């Protein structure tokens, strides 16, 4: 190899890019990571939950050294109206293996740590530089243009986030449709460690993950989230971009109203706002995926649409990590063959099919199922109304619970209930 040519150039030092760099560098590959932010993770925004299985496979016992916040042991799923909420609460008190747990994380700290692992293995990192173009020669990607310089590589891995302009320039991705992404806003609210543990009934490093549907996004597709960190709360909401044209409130106003909701306000009372961030996040999964493989190029992470919104949980970080690992394995195999053609790099799809694509394929119809206004208006209202009737005792003549439930179900419509229920069964 010429000293002027890297084995791989990775655009983006997020989870997919950092993991790809780590796996490649461990095997002696000459790797350069280019990050436009001032540090790894500086441009990344997420609610904050990492399912450990994918990174545990790459760095066994990573939680003992990584800057994780809390291990999630408490789950809450709330259906909200403007002034009420019906919440499903689950607590896992059983011992779980290292690959079965999940953690709340702060990406600015966690991504920086993960990139440090790649650098210690031999990868090189350049920050504060934007990649302007991907360089092609005879139809094959041979490097990138960054800050006026041409940097060459045998393969380029694009892990530059949702709405990858580089993938679009290569003709591997179409312009992102509004229906495929959502706008996410997040606040980091500081509270004493003991206060967080008291309010969420936590002990030690236990953590809580809370998702909210209905009122947080003013009845539009999306929802609110709250994750407990060690001394902060990650609070925010996500709303489908294509629905915002119908919104009666701005996203900042939605967030402010969410914070004032009686089910949320007591949890954040007395907290200090220490950070605010906004980001565009992928929502459509496989329905928005670009062409993942080209001559001399692979696409991974958010740039490849690696995200799953299942309603009851949201996954993205573990999928990005698996995609980064798959990309690295593919490049290592191609290096042995000295063949970086599209056909040779097609092995990437095989690795993905054994991991993230398997899960994404199973739930690929779910985004369309959730894109139903009743999910965020009629059903939260029905759930809260039934709960209110169940727990209200006012001395009046009792009404059988089945009649109360039927009364509220009629408001949704029995045909709608059957239609949505049948569709849900086929999707899930």
Curated annotation (Swiss-Prot):
<comment type="function">
    <text>Could be part of an electron transfer system required for anaerobic carnitine reduction.</text>
</comment>
<dbReference type="InterPro" id="IPR039651">
    <property type="entry name" value="FixC-like"/>
</dbReference>
<keyword id="KW-0560">Oxidoreductase</keyword>
<dbReference type="GO" id="GO:0071949">
    <property type="term" value="F:FAD binding"/>
</dbReference>
<protein>
    <recommendedName>
        <fullName>Protein FixC</fullName>
    </recommendedName>
</protein>
<dbReference type="GO" id="GO:0016491">
    <property type="term" value="F:oxidoreductase activity"/>
</dbReference>
<keyword id="KW-0813">Transport</keyword>
<keyword id="KW-0249">Electron transport</keyword>
<dbReference type="Pfam" id="PF01494">
    <property type="entry name" value="FAD_binding_3"/>
</dbReference>
<keyword id="KW-0274">FAD</keyword>
<comment type="similarity">
    <text>Belongs to the ETF-QO/FixC family.</text>
</comment>
<dbReference type="InterPro" id="IPR036188">
    <property type="entry name" value="FAD/NAD-bd_sf"/>
</dbReference>
<keyword id="KW-0285">Flavoprotein</keyword>
<dbReference type="InterPro" id="IPR002938">
    <property type="entry name" value="FAD-bd"/>
</dbReference>
């Amino acid at each position: 190899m010429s000293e002027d040519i890297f084995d791989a150039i990775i655009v983006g030092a997020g989870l997919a890019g950092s993991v790809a760099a780590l796996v490649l560098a461990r095997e002696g590959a000459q790797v350069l990571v280019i990050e436009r932010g001032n540090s790894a993770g500086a441009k990344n925004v997420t609610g904050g939950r990492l399912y450990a299985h994918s990174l545990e496979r790459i760095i066994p016992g990573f939680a003992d050294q990584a800057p994780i916040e809390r291990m999630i042991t408490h789950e809450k799923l709330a259906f909200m109206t403007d002034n009420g909420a019906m919440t499903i609460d689950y607590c896992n008190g059983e011992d779980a293996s290292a690959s079965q747990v999940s953690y709340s994380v702060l990406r600015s700290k966690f991504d920086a740590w993960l990139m440090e692992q790649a650098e210690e293995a031999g990868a090189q990192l350049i920050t504060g530089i934007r990649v302007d173009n991907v360089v092609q020669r005879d139809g094959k990607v041979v490097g990138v243009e960054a800050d006026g310089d041409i940097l060459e590589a045998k393969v380029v891995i694009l892990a530059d986030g949702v709405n990858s302009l580089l993938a679009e320039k290569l003709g591997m991705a179409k312009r992102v449709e509004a229906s495929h992404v959502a706008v996410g806003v997040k606040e980091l609210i500081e509270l004493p460690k003991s206060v967080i543990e008291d309010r969420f009934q936590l002990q030690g490093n236990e953590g809580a993950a809370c998702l909210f549907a209905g009122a947080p996004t003013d009845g539009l597709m999306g929802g609110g989230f709250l994750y407990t960190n060690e001394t902060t709360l990650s609070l925010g909401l996500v709303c489908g971009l294509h629905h915002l044209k119908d919104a009666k409130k701005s996203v900042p106003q939605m967030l402010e109203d969410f914070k004032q909701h009686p089910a949320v306000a007591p949890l954040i009372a007395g907290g200090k706002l220490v950070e605010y961030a906004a980001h565009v996040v992928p929502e459509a999964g496989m329905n928005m995926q670009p062409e993942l493989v080209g001559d001399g190029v692979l696409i991974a992470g958010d740039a490849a649409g690696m995200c799953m919104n299942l309603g009851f949980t949201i996954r993205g970080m573990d999928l990005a990590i698996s995609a980064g690992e798959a990309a690295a394995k593919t490049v290592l195999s191609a290096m042995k063959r000295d063949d970086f053609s599209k056909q040779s790099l097609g092995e990437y799809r095989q690795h993905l099919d054994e991991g993230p694509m398997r899960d994404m394929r199973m739930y690929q119809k779910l985004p369309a199922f959730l894109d139903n206004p009743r999910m965020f208006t009629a059903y939260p209202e029905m759930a809260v109304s039934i709960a209110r009737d169940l727990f209200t005792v006012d001395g009046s003549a009792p009404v059988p619970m089945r009649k109360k439930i039927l009364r509220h179900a009629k408001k949704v419509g029995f045909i709608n209930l059957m239609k949505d229920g049948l569709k849900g069964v086929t999707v899930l």
